[in-house]
């Protein structure tokens, strides 16, 4: 069965070609070992001079380990699931206990660390028209479209998009998609983002999550993506999202006439591209976000969080942005004689700029959110499904703060185990 054939291969957007078995099993995973040569104190941005000479610190992690299961029922009906383990954790859920004077109660039973990130049923009517219903990946931005670790050179996911957008963005709803010639489209209706989960350090990133055992959907969100493949190995893409973020939490606060006119209109727009040639690969992205009524939303959140409500406490800015580009060259291409054609050794560089908090005129500024970052390193692929990664990165903050260099080593896999 075929779901999509993109220039940048994404396991979540493809299923294996025709085979004797109807079952598809696949997945991806990554391990990351990092040494950070800057302070890990939580006050390093509010009092940077006090932590300038702090010792380095190390962090070892398994950011993602994912299993895909797909099945072709026949006659155009297919299903797919994705189970993701993040950081080897379990997670927790929050409930509002009215038997305990309306206090918030934390229960260790469900959360974002072990998640069912996809679970959908699809009916394919034609290559140009397919319908999915269930829990879907929302392909807004280059990272959400191709979030598997062999689709970027860095040890960790591209930092700018990962900071300001939900990642991997998954939500429950319905999707219409298809491909005709050099074009592919997708339109989604999903549960809207929650403005009470927006914040200073990550913009709307946490807005797609839910601390409850259900996803609030008082407001709907609308997302779309269009891909163009003008020439071989090149993809150009536009994507975006719109929804109202206010009045989309629990309990429903629409009765509160004081804030009835506060909508929290949320607009996200993104452009991304990928060129994957025989020896040279380049990828890039540009993302922009807007939230109306940011000042009022920040005030409401601050008042709510004083009652231990499970919302983000810091203010959200009116805008956020991210832009990045990376390029890699296969050094083994210089030595064609006698080498294994399956192996690749990329020398790569990446630059990105992002700011998760661009305030409205009446909001305070927090300049540490304005960042540039460079990364250089190598990716060795002994097989097309496995990558060993090494990099040096340097995060540049404004002059009153301390810069943040680090070195990282990682290993990742991505592929189908059975078809």
Describe the predicted segments one by one.
Residues 59, 86-87, 166, 216, ...:
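Solvent-exposed loop/turn segments connecting transmembrane beta-strands
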Residues 38-40, 51-54, 97-99, 104-109, ...:
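Outer-membrane beta-barrel pore domains
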Residues 107-108, 163, 202, 209-213, ...:
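Active-site rim elements
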Residues 18-22, 33-63, 203, 209-213, ...:
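Surface-exposed strand-loop-strand hairpins of Gram-negative outer-membrane beta-barrel proteins
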Residues 167, 213-220, 261-265:
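Active-site glycine- and acidic-residue-rich loops that bind
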């Amino acid at each position: 069965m075929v779901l999509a054939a993109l220039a940048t291969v994404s396991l979540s957007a493809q299923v294996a070609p025709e085979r004797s078995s109807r079952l598809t099993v696949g997945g991806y995973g990554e391990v990351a070992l990092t040494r950070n040569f800057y302070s890990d104190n939580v006050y390093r941005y509010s009092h940077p001079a006090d932590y300038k000479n702090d010792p380095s610190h190390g962090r070892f992690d398994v950011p993602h380990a994912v299993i895909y299961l797909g099945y072709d029922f026949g006659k155009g009906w297919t299903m797919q699931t994705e189970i993701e383990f993040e950081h080897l954790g379990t997670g927790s859920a929050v409930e509002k206990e009215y038997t305990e004077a309306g206090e918030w109660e934390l229960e260790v039973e469900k959360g974002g660390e072990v998640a069912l990130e996809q679970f959908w049923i699809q009916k394919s009517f034609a290559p140009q028209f397919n319908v999915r219903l269930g829990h879907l990946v929302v392909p807004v931005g280059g990272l959400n479209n191709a979030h598997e670790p062999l689709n970027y050179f860095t040890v960790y996911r591209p930092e700018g998009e990962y900071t300001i957008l939900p990642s991997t963005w998954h939500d429950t709803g319905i999707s219409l998609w298809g491909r005709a010639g050099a074009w592919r489209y997708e339109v989604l209706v999903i549960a809207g983002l929650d403005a009470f989960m927006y914040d200073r350090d990550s913009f709307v990133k946490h807005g797609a999550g839910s601390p409850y055992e259900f996803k609030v959907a008082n407001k709907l969100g609308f997302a779309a993506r269009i891909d163009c493949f003008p020439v071989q190995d090149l993809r150009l893409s536009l994507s975006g999202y719109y929804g109202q973020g206010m009045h989309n939490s629990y309990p429903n606060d629409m009765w509160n006439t004081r804030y009835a006119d506060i909508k929290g209109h949320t607009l996200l727009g993104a452009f991304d591209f990928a060129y994957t040639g025989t020896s040279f690969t380049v990828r890039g992205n540009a993302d922009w976000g807007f939230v109306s009524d940011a000042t009022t939303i920040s005030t409401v959140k601050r008042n709510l969080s004083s009652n231990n409500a499970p919302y983000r406490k810091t203010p959200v800015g009116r805008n956020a942005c991210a832009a990045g580009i990376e390029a890699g060259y296969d050094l083994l291409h210089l030595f064609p004689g006698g080498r294994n054609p399956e192996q690749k050794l990329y020398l790569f560089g990446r630059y990105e700029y992002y700011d998760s908090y661009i305030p409205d005129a009446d909001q305070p500024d927090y300049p540490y959110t304005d960042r540039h970052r460079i990364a250089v390193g190598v990716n060795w692929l002994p097989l097309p499904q496995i990558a060993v990664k090494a990099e040096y990165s340097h995060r540049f903050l404004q002059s009153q703060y301390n810069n943040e260099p680090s070195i990282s080593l990682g290993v990742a896999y991505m592929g189908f185990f059975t078809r």
